[in-house]
Amino acid sequence: LRIGVIQVPAFYRDFRAESEGSRDFTSTTRDVRRLISELEGKRIDGLVIDLRGNGGGSLTEATSLTGLFIDEGPVVQVKDALGKVEVEVDPDPGVVYSGPLAVLVDRNSASASEIFAGAIQDYGRGIIIGEPTFGKGTVQTLIDLNRYVAGDGEDLGRLRLTMAEFFRVSGGSTQLKGVEPDILLPTAEYLADHGERSLDNPLPWDSIRPARYTKVSLVDMQGLLEGSRERVARDPGFQMLIASERI
């Protein structure tokens, strides 16, 4: 099998260049689209999007990147402090890549990474592999206190305010729980002291009404899970982790 792997370190977009009218501004979606075209020219049998260590970035890019793999529909729901819900929708109807898809995640995959992985999982478009993700399902803004308080020149710092929450199209939040992988890759380290769940007074997990979307269900999840269990059962390293109650 020929498997293409695209590592996505962040969800970036050059908003300044875009606002200045540049036609070739950089963005995650544009770069991934180009790489997919190159990989399909090499006749790949499947594609892996590697989001391990990706702490997030642009919501716009998380939405548009998801759109490369689904035809159309909602990608994520955003609920503000007043309870108003806005649905972010795939901005570009059509599919750039329709073949087998896997998404690699780990404990440091956060925010926009969780939006992308959660949408791919909800649509049944691909399989999520790795560790439970970071669990950051909130939106913050930074307020520069120096702009509002007259001082003697001393830097008063900045205040970070939570202003909204992310919810998957299936209705559940990514807060605290993150995205649970379809196939868990065992780790020798505990996850309880990592991510939002390790912070003092984090916002609790919540859910809202699911958005209207149509599942693609291109994955034989049952067959993949059975194959994974068989490989784990045969692997001495996995069995050692199981015996030590690490997984």
Task: Give the location of each predicted region.
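Polar, glycine-rich mid-to-C-terminal structural blocks
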Residues: 124, 129-196
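Generic structural signal for residues positioned in beta-strands
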Residues: 5, 74, 100, 158-162, ...
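Cleft-lining beta-strand/loop regions that shape enzyme active-site pockets
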Residues: 1-150, 165
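Conserved functional hotspot residues or short segments at active or partner-binding sites
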Residues: 169-247
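A broadly tuned preference for mixed-charge, low-complexity surface segments
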Residues: 96-108, 154-171, 213-229
